[in-house]
């Protein structure tokens, strides 16, 4: 659980200039959807038009399709699409479930499948792949990228299991 715990902390403490204290994941996702909606409106499609939501969804899906070729990109893209639909439908419960998945809080695949229809969860084995997907997504969402700062990295050396300690050390070096 050390790698997944690291991932959870990184996502929980995600910050942007307008929300420097952390917890910015929802804001980033909502800002992305709002920016796509604004771009569609500036393209001449009225927000009152029946074509508006369709055009927004097409733009969102074009970003999502680009992610499907990345490792775990298909599931990540599916969850972004679910978040978008929950956003437009005002379904706060579904948004919360998608955010729970993005934060790595699902502990079983069964629970994720029942609540979201996805058969994959973020684990110790693949958390770094999801961090890379977030970095890619942030670029698509209009940010310059994702910068990761580790404070008190010495805590890795305090992990009692040598294999876990080495694995986490190697992941951080890879970053």
State what each model feature region is.
Residues 142-162:
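Conserved P-loop NTPase "ATPase switch" module shared by AAA+ and STAND
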Residues 127-131, 163-175:
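Substrate-gripping "pore-loop 1 plus following alpha2 helix"
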Residues 1-141:
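P-loop NTPase nucleotide-binding core
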Residues 41-44, 150, 162-165:
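Generic alpha-helix signal with a bias toward terminal, lower-confidence helices
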């Amino acid at each position: 659980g050390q790698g997944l715990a690291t991932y959870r902390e990184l996502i929980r403490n995600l910050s942007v200039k307008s929300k420097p204290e952390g917890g910015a994941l929802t804001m980033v996702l909502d800002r992305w959807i709002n920016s796509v909606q604004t771009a569609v409106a500036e393209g001449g499609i009225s927000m009152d038009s029946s074509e508006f939501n369709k055009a927004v969804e097409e733009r969102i899906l074009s970003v999502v399709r680009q992610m499907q070729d990345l490792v775990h990109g298909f599931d990540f893209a599916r969850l972004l699409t679910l978040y978008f639909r929950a956003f437009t439908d005002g379904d706060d419960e579904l948004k919360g479930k998608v955010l729970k998945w993005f934060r790595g809080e699902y502990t079983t695949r069964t629970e994720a499948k029942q609540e979201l229809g996805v058969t994959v969860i973020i684990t110790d084995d693949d958390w770094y792949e999801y961090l890379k997907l977030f970095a890619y997504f942030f670029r698509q969402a209009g940010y310059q990228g994702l910068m990761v700062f580790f404070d008190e990295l010495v805590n890795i050396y305090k992990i009692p299991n040598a294999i876990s300690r080495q694995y986490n050390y190697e992941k951080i070096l890879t970053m």
